[in-house]
């Protein structure tokens, strides 16, 4: 369009989507992932300067509890305005409510600055570890529906993520009560209340929705250690 997207440093190396996405998909094919029925969803924001591509793998479905299945999901992010590092992230997709479930393992995210030293091979090597990270996390999450959490702990977690935003705290509390009616006052209800907000809460500017969801997911990812503390203490 000729419209300026951003001003970046002299060492910045723009990696076109037309280059990085096919490379990433070749890495998926060459990995140990079962790609039967794979689904791809592409979203963009900020005038197409930021791109999120999510791959969902139905053949890697795990039941957390009866009639509650999660599927492996891997996302790749790329930007033309220098705002995002190139990254790939491991997550999961909850079939029951269509929530994107973020994974907090430090090895679940690969990041690399846009520069001449961008190492695509290292990124694809991280992709090969994705299945193990996913399996490990699902094993832990199977405890969540069985782990009761107190109202005080729930309030601490929601206050941590909401800060001074009373509307956000109210939204999280409302989500939690909805999930409690299905799963009881458990860690699973807390996690789903958080990911429900990240995935489904309205955004002011629909054109930037992909970026907003990413920022919300980062907040949820930062809070996951608090949930793990509750699980371990149970």
Residue locations for each model-derived region?
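Feature for intrinsically disordered/low-complexity regulatory segments and propeptides
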Residues: 1-23, 32-34, 193, 198
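Generic, low-specificity signal for short hydrophobic/alpha-helical stretches with a mild N-terminal bias
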Residues: 2, 6, 37, 116-119, ...
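Sparse, context-dependent recognition of short Cys/His-centered cofactor- or disulfide-binding micro-motifs
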Residues: 5, 9, 40, 61
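Compositionally biased, low-complexity repeat tracts
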Residues: 5, 43-45, 96, 100
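Short, well-structured alpha-helical interface segments that form or flank functional binding sites
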Residues: 15-26, 48-52, 71
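A short acidic/basic microdomain associated with nuclease active sites
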Residues: 29-57
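Intrinsically disordered, low-complexity regions enriched in serine/threonine
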Residues: 58-234
